[in-house]
UniProtKB/Swiss-Prot annotation:
Entry's Gene Ontology molecular function annotations: cyclin-dependent protein serine/threonine kinase regulator activity
Upper classification of the organism: Eukaryota, Viridiplantae, Streptophyta, Embryophyta, Tracheophyta
Segments of skewed composition (Basic and acidic residues): 384-405
Pfam family, one: Cyclin_N
PROSITE patterns membership: CYCLINS
Keyword Cell cycle part of the UniProt annotation: yes
Protein name listed in UniProt: Putative cyclin-D2-3
Family: Belongs to the cyclin family. Cyclin D subfamily.
Annotated stretches, region: Disordered: 377-405
Any GO BP: G1/S transition of mitotic cell cycle
Gene3D superfamilies: Cyclin-like
SMART domains from the UniProt entry: CYCLIN, Cyclin_C
InterPro entries the record matches: Cyclin, Cyclin-like_dom, Cyclin-like_sf, Cyclin_C-dom, Cyclin_N, Cyclins_cyclin-box
Organism of derivation: Oryza sativa subsp. japonica
Length: 405
């Protein structure tokens, strides 16, 4: 199986393979044409929802049984993801505040920076973190200081997959590595890591997230009042702010979405009896868990208010004088970037431009990068061989069973 790692051009053949998701929301979620007329008559704020990363399927509709049936199917699906995320000692390691926690926070910071740099939708960033957590909880992936490049390779692969799932024009794997990453990998190495992530997650990449429910739940809790773009933006902000806090890994996406909707409606000036609102809305969620999730959000908001740093500081970065860590790239390729054709710079190489004063340091990093690049390639080759061996054993067992029958 190959990957299309170069930019699409008008001359590219239509049959070229890529991981770009060509399905629309209806084919993914099993919707039919009946939803077209409903979508066309929705409030203009739906356009705002879609621009923020909500798809039409995320607005599950109001009235009738279709929306409730979709909610039920999504809640069944999210249970499987909860099992994956809570498996093993992953949450325990994060709760202990060790290197796993610091690496996860650094990963989310970088993902958010790239999201802001390319103006990705919020769902793209959320999916990248979702893939990261599910992968780390599903395999024995040792986070150590000896191989920091391994962590960066995994993060890039998760974000690349999320961009291919959600963005209509996902950048190439090399272009994706902006905002001063410590290591930069070549396309082949990243694609190998993508395959490892895909197989580990059993190709279940259309994850259920709080964004899946928020439009429907907000409409229920807001009691039919107009859903404004301010409410939608506030929901998005709170959902993204929950990514770093590991306490929210213990809650289902539906519970997070309910707590977010309650918080946003209450912040709008309405006095809510949370228990009464949940009872009247008839949302199929655990009310006790929603209460605990809402309390965690209030505590998180209090910490952010008392912090001297601005909440937007995590998204601030300096791209005026970036330094390219040329790991995995050839020295001649690194040097050529500073004098490459103008069209290449306009197509995405500008963030990697190297100044003359940085040339010597970049060459030193290239030499060190080849050594680390060999380690990354060796890891991917070993993982590929292990996967092929596992698939082969499974095939032999199936043949034996078929022969016995």
């Amino acid at each position: 199986m190959g990957f299309l790692c170069r930019r699409r051009s008008s001359a590219a053949p239509a049959e070229s393979f890529s991981l770009l998701c060509e399905e629309d929301s209806e084919s993914v979620f099993g919707s039919d044409d009946d939803g077209v007329e409903e979508t066309a008559t929705m409030a203009p704020e739906l356009g705002k929802m879609m621009s923020l990363g909500f798809s039409a399927s995320h607005h599950l509709g109001d009235g009738g049984g279709g929306g409730e049936e979709l909610v039920g199917s999504f809640m069944e699906k999210e249970v499987e993801q909860m099992v994956e995320t809570a498996r093993g000692e992953y949450l325990t390691k994060l709760s202990n505040g060790g290197i796993e926690l610091s690496c996860r926070i650094a990963a989310i910071d970088w993902i958010c920076k790239v999201q802001a740099y390319y103006s990705f939708g919020p769902l793209c960033a959320y999916l990248a973190v979702n893939y990261l957590d599910r992968f780390l909880s599903s395999v024995e992936f040792s986070v150590t200081n000896d191989m920091p490049w391994m962590q960066q390779l995994l993060i890039v692969a998760c974000l690349s997959l999320a961009a291919k799932m959600e963005e209509t024009a996902a950048p190439g794997t090399l272009d994706l590595q902006v905002c001063n990453p410590e290591y930069v990998f070549d396309a082949e190495t990243i694609h190998r890591m993508e395959i490892i992530v895909l197989t580990t997650l059993k190709w279940r990449m259309q994850a259920v997230t709080p964004f899946t429910y928020i439009g429907h739940f907000l409409d229920k809790i807001n009691e039919g009042n107009r859903i404004t773009s301010e409410l939608i933006s506030r929901c998005t902000e709170i959902i993204l702010s929950t990514m770093k806090a590991t306490v929210f890994l213990r809650f289902r996406p539906s519970e997070i979405a309910t707590a977010v909707a309650l918080s946003v409606v209450a912040d709008g000036g309405r006095v809510l009896d949370f228990g009464g609102v949940l009872e009247s809305s008839k949302l199929p969620v655990d009310k006790d868990n929603v209460g605990r999730c809402h309390q965690a959000m209030q505590e998180m908001a209090l910490v952010m208010q008392n912090s001297t740093a601005s909440p937007s500081d995590s998204l601030c970065y300096d791209m005026t004088n970036p330094v390219l860590d040329c790991h995995i790239l050839r020295r001649r390729e690194c040097v050529s970037l500073q004098s490459g054709p103008r069209d290449e710079l306009e197509m995405g190489w500008a963030p990697f431009a190297i100044t003359v004063s940085e040339k010597e340091e970049s060459e030193r990093r290239c030499d060190d990068g080849w050594r680390r690049g060999g380690e990354a390639a060796q890891y991917c080759e070993q993982a590929d061989e292990q996967r092929r061996s596992t698939d082969g054993r499974a095939g032999v067992r199936l043949e034996e069973q078929a022969g016995g029958e």
